[in-house]
Every structure is written in structure tokens, then in C-alpha cells.
Amino acid sequence: LPKTTRVMTTSSQGWKAAFTAFLDRRALIMLFLGFSAGIPILLIFSSLSLWLGEAGIEKSAVTFFSWAALGYSFKFVWAPLIDELPVPFLTKTLGRRRAWLLIAQILIIGAISIMAFSDPSLGQAHLYQMAVGAVLLGFSAATQDIVIDAYRIELAETQMQTILASTYNAGYRIGMIVAGAGALFLAAYLGTAKGNYIYDAWKYTYLAMAGVMVIGVITTLIVREPQVDRVKKSYKKSDYYRLVIVFFFAVLGFVCSYIYGDNLVSIIKTSLGIKDSFALFGLEALRFIGSGAIALLLGSVLVKMGAVNKQMAYETWVNPIADFFRRYGVKLALVLLLLIGFYRISDIISGVISNVFYQDLNFTKEQIAEAVKVYGVIFSLIGGFLGGLLAQRMNIMKLMFVGAVLASATNLVFIGLVKSGHSLGDVVVQVGSEQYVAQPDEVGQWTVQVPSQVLAQDHQINVHTYYADDKSTQRDIQLPYLIEQNQPQIHLLPITSDDHISAKEAKQSIVVKGQLTGITVDQLEADKPVILKLDGQEFTAKVDSNNIFSGAIDGKVLQASSTKKITAIAQLKENTQVLQAQRPYQLVSEKQSLDVDIQPIMPIKADQGDVEIKGKVIKEYSSLWLYFAIVVDNLAAGLAGAAFIAFLSSLTSVSFTAVQYAIFSSLMTLTPKILGGYSGTIVTKIGYPDFFLMTTLIGIPILFLVVWVGKLLKEHQKL
């Protein structure tokens, strides 16, 4: 084999040596660099979404924010530049990896600061400034990831890679906790909240996160540059500048074609009526391949025109790929790429839908946060350390096999979680003297069709259901609705399902909803379209496009009320008419375990045909099953992830570390994430139990693929 190839070996170290490997200086370096890598991602996604939400802005309103994610998805596109381009002064002073790492970290601090000094509530200009900061943060954070991955691979031999991957992952998770939960706690401590937006709180929170990045900068400055034998290249400065220009135009072609290709895909889907998940996946794959082809064509044309040194362009973009196929041969290289693209498919596809799944099982945000963010993170780290430990004692391919078995088999535990609740009886919807029966699915969703003529004869539906094994648990819920008339009307929907607020519910904000009919939103006062009143206190409610209004009231305020009665008031513009509706409620110590949530019914017209009434039976599922499922799933994912990172690292050539690993890591998540985008559609069609069974079965071919790759690699190493 060429000397630049990393060979996977079978370790025979003792357990003591395996444990002490985690205290190696290189492992500690990766812990701190992992922390630095874990800070930015949540500042772009979840924490930013909460900030924008408190400022009264939907993140989706600015499509520019979606570009921030492109940096992570397509980092392999500019990874060759990171491998090839020297940084004036810094490369000679710090070395190739540390120079780029320092630049990336400084850009991250700058990007976070740009976001901190942007108040989205002040208007579009400030919102675009924040979007620019988010995009810069996405690309600079992805650049940091490229360099850290290359640094890790060059820092130690293959046998040590699982240890480095484990400590890197531990640092990454800690960084995510600081930027996620830590940022939210700090913002809340500084006083901001939903309905009480304070810009300075978010400003100082983001500046604090920028300050935390100094840990990464200090680490970069005090560690040593990896010693790697590389072929010295001597090109003119102008050659490098021209290379950057060609790269810029190629990337611009890729990004533009990928973004605008979405419009073409939408037109094709609409015109041909494509709804099949696999057909949609094929379209998305063609969109990605087409964008890559356009970038490649644009780059090739510029190279042929002499816009850049041809030899330099070949060494930058073609050599890394050619090297991989040259070292492993076409057959083995293609099989390796197949394994890389599909190894994590089972757990990534199930992971995409996980938060929605937990919510569908009626677990609270607090329960989900505790289970996922605390126990999930802890056992993911334990799984990573276990993977690193076993890698010192096992052949990496055997460990990959164990990881693949666990990653897919643990999805079966989620079927147990779905089955942990009581079986439900029929849902009976009664309108006047007419009854309609529905069978709820495994998470309680149900729907019935009721003729509008029947609904027009009443103003309320009655819904009752029970546990299939205990009819004494029957629950009866009423929901009022409006009949469409020419005159304006307003009414309040039940506060909770039955106007009863439990002591547990009173600990959080309660959303009060109601409906308007006979008027449009434009006819209401702009600043306060609907006001909710309770004991003289006023709370502003927002009105959506369906004329359903909603406003949040603190549960403690509802609990302390003397009247226990909410009034909704709508003031019409240029009109003295005021619409009012009242709704009393009661306090109870606790509520029944069985409940029914019914979606608001739009105002009824007698001649509109059948009306679809939807709802959800809310029952309790085992919290013990929830914690067990999350613990074993994250333990398996952590172990499989550590083994897989070590495997990917072993495939890279020292001459093209950054490029090859960036390609591998992007390929690792690209296919599963594209398929994962259709998880919701699949669940709707087949339900959760069959979905998790499907994700388990998907993992079986991967086991054969791991065995096949292991056999081919053994044969290859004998050559």
C-alpha cells in the first residue's frame, strides 16, 4: 500500500491501557476543540428560533436564514481550498491547520457578534443583518469543522481515532448544552420571555456565547501543529487568488442552481401530481446531482479558459477523489462509498421524527427536555466512550457490525413505548340526535365526516371515549361552534378541553383560543385586534388567517383570579360596535388521565357539504419506557458513531485529509437526511409501530454490507 494509506488494525491492548488512552494529551485537545465546534450550531437553529419567536417574527419569513444550513450540508465543496491555500503570515507562524482554525474561530466570534447587535423587532433591515450574521456563522462554523476533522485525523494513528472521536463528541455535546440550554437559561435570567421580549437580554446572551468561543481560540494557540509529511508545493500568489475566484464562481453556480432548483422540483411535483416518497427522493437527488454538475461544468469551463493554473486546479479538486479510487480500486471504493452513505440510515431516519413522536405521545416539553437533553446526552457520551474503549480491544469492522446491530435494533424499543399506553375504545361524536363513530390510531388521532346540514341544526358537538379495557373511564367533552351569518360574531373556545385547570396546568402559560366570523382581520384594530380580559388585566391575542384568535395567560394569574371568568373583546375599526364573549373556568386538584382535544370547527354553512372534524385522544404513556428508549437509543448511537468516525478517518489519505473526510462526513448524512424528510409522510401512511419496524429492517442489509466491506478490506490489505 502507499505510505499515505491508513491501515485498520486489530488492537491487543489491555483494559488499563485502553482506559488511560482517554487521558492522553491528544484526547484532551479534542475535548476542547469539540467544545468549540459545538457552540455555533444551536445559535443558528433552536436558540435563534426562540429569539425570533419572542420578537414576534417567524423564522420562515426570511428564506435567507435557510442558507445558514448550506454550510454544514455542502462543506466538502470548499474543503479543497482549506487543504491547499496557505494563509499569509499565519500559516508560517502557526502551521496550516491552526492558521485556518484561528481564522474560522475569529469569523465565528464576529458572526455571533453581528447577530447580537441585530434587533429583529426593529424592522426588515435589522432582520437581514441578523440573517447575514447567521449565514456567516453557518459557513465559518462548517469551516471550523473541516479543519478540526483534518487536525484530529492527522493528530494520531487509526487505532487512536475512536478515542479522539469520543472525546471530541463529548466536547461537542457540552458545547451544544452551553449554546442551547445555557443560552436559554441566561436569556431567561436576564428577563426576556414570550410576551415580554427584551432585546438586551438576547444581545448579552449572544455576546456571552461569543466570549465562550475564546476557549477554542486559546486551545488553537497553545496546541501543536500535527507533523505530517506532505509534498511541498510552490505556486505564485496570483495562482492562489485565481483559484479562489474560480472556486467562488463554481460555488455560486452550485448554490444558485440548488436554491432555484427547488422551484423546478415544485413545478414538476405539482404538474405530475407526484406524492410517492421514493419518487420525491429521486427528484431531490436529481436536484442535488444537477447542481453539482452545473458547478463542475462552470469550473471546468473556467479552467479551460485559463482562469486558473490547470495543474493546480487538478491537484485541488480532482486528485483527492482520484487518490481514493487509486488506493482502493474502483470496486472497493464504490462499495465503501455505499457503506458510508447508508451506515447511519436506520437511526438518522428515526431520529428526524423523534421530537414529533414524543409530542404525539403527549409527553410535555419538560419531560422531553429532561429525557433527551439530560439522559440522552449523558448516555450518548457513555456510548461514545464505550466505543472508544472497545476499539482498543476489537477490530474496527467488528465494532462497526456491533454498532450497526444496536443502532437498528434499538428502534424496536420505540414500538414498546407506543404500546405502553392503554388501548383506546371508539370515539363517538354526537351532534343533536346523530352519532358518528371513529377508531383512534395508536397515538389517539381520529377524524369523522359530518354533513353540514346536521351541524347547522345545533351549536355544539359532544364527544366521548373510554379505555377499551375499562368503560368506567368514559370521558365526555363538548365543543361549541359558530353558524355562518352576515353579522359579526365572537366566541371563546373551552379553556383546556373542559374548562377545568389543574394545579399542574397552572404552573405554565395556558393558551386561550376563540373564533370570529362575519368580519375580516383588516376590520379589527391593528395593534390590539382581540383583547382577553381577566380581573381588569388585559392580554393581547393574535388572529390567524382562519379568524381563530389565541393569547397566552400565565397559569398563576388564572389560578389567583377572583372571578374565574375570561372575557374576549374585539373592537372594529371606524365602528362603535364592540364584540364580546365570556367563558368561566374552574380549578381542580388534578385531571383525569384520559382527555380529548378537538380542533376548532370553522363557522358552518348549511350548504357546504361534509365537514371534517378532527381530534386527539390524550392518554398517558409510560415515562419509564420513554427514558429506557432514549437511554438505549443514545447509547447505541454514541457507540456506532464513535466506531464510524474512526472508520472514516482510517479511509483518508494524509495528503488529502480535509477534502476526503469532508466528502465522507457529508455523504454520511446526506442520503439519510433526504430520506428522513419523508418520515412524516411515511408515519401518516403506516403508523408509528410499522415505521419503527421499517427502520429496523432497513438496518439488516447494512449488516451484510459491513461484513462484505470487512472481507474486501482484508483482501485489499494482502495485496
Predicted regions and their residues:
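Helix-loop boundary and gating motifs at the non-cytosolic
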Residues: 12-72, 257-266, 334-339, 343-357
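C-terminal ends and interior cores of transmembrane alpha-helices
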Residues: 101-124, 406-423
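Transmembrane alpha-helices of Major Facilitator/SLC transporters
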Residues: 75-78, 290-300, 371-394, 403, ...
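Helix-to-loop junctions at the C-terminal end of transmembrane segments
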Residues: 76-93, 383-399, 683-684
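Loop-to-transmembrane helix entry/capping segments in MFS-fold secondary transporters
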Residues: 59, 158-167, 365-366, 654-664
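A late C-terminal transmembrane helix in Major Facilitator Superfamily
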Residues: 657-684
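Intracellular loop-helix junctions on the cytosolic face of multi-pass helical membrane proteins
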Residues: 2-24, 116-131, 158-339, 456, ...
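C-terminal transmembrane helical hairpin of 12-TM major facilitator-type secondary transporters
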Residues: 400-425, 430, 618-643
